[in-house]
């Protein structure tokens, strides 16, 4: 595969439409159409090995997505902690209810587990470690699933207010729902983890089964 630089004003390149997303609306998601488009030779960036070279950027990309996701989780815990320590129900603040307190403990633990794995994966990428690819995919999928649980607890602990625009929790919930699908799905990350851990039997160049 080869890669080319295509300026936005290139004849034959059009943006068919831009899609709105459930969450993470800071992104621009557009459908590109290439029709009878001429790209000059001097716009060639990488010849023959573009996909392999692009893979170098997949690792930090997953780190960045996991870090954004962690930020969503941290904010979920912040706003929920404030809410349950001030909102009264049945004559008591919410945090005095055992079920509420247990959910807070789960949220905090999940956030710290994601943070620890994110730090380890980041160090592996910086050091060029052999297990960097596996760790990047681990933190991508783990953060996606765990922070979604954190956001769900945040919405639940706000009760009906969790679905109200004024409280902001619904936005965090929508953002958390996007991350499992960014930079590859969770299942794709799991496949990559297995291939990295067991290259001889599950990897791209594994031998044929007899």
Spans of model-derived segments:
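C-terminal helix-coil-helix/basic helical segment that borders enzyme active sites and/or dimer interfaces
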Residues: 81-95, 108-142, 155-160
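Charge-rich, acidic-biased intrinsically disordered regions
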Residues: 96, 100, 133-141, 162-178
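Conserved H-D interstitial segment of serine endopeptidase catalytic domains
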Residues: 6-8
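Glycine-rich beta->alpha junctions and the first turn(s) of the following alpha-helix
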Residues: 3, 13-112, 179, 195, ...
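Hydrophobic alpha-helical segments of membrane proteins
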Residues: 146-154
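Active-site lining segments that contact anionic ligands and/or coordinate catalytic metals
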Residues: 1, 29, 60, 99, ...
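Glycine-rich phosphate/cofactor-binding loops in nucleotide/flavin-utilizing enzymes
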Residues: 158-210
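Generic, well-ordered alpha-helical scaffold segments in large soluble proteins
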Residues: 76-83, 120, 124, 153, ...
């Amino acid at each position: 595969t080869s890669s080319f630089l295509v300026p936005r004003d290139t004849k034959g390149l059009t943006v068919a439409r831009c899609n709105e997303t459930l969450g993470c609306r800071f992104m621009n998601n557009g459908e590109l159409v290439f029709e009878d488009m001429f790209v000059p030779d001097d716009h060639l960036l990488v010849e023959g090995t573009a996909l392999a070279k692009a893979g170098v950027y997949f690792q930090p990309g997953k780190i960045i997505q996991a870090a954004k996701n962690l930020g969503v989780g941290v904010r979920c815990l912040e706003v929920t902690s404030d809410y349950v320590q001030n909102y009264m129900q049945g004559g008591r603040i919410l945090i005095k209810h055992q079920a509420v307190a247990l959910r807070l403990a789960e949220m905090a633990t999940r956030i710290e587990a994601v943070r620890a794995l994110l730090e380890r994966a980041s160090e592996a990428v910086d050091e060029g470690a052999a297990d960097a690819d596996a760790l990047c995919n681990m933190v991508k999928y783990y953060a996606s699933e765990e922070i979604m649980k954190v956001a769900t607890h945040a919405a639940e602990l706000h009760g009906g207010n969790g679905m109200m625009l004024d409280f902001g929790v619904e936005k965090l919930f929508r953002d958390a729902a996007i991350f499992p699908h960014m930079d590859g799905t969770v299942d794709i990350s799991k496949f990559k983890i297995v291939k990295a851990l067991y290259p001889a039997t599950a990897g791209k160049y594994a031998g044929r089964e007899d």
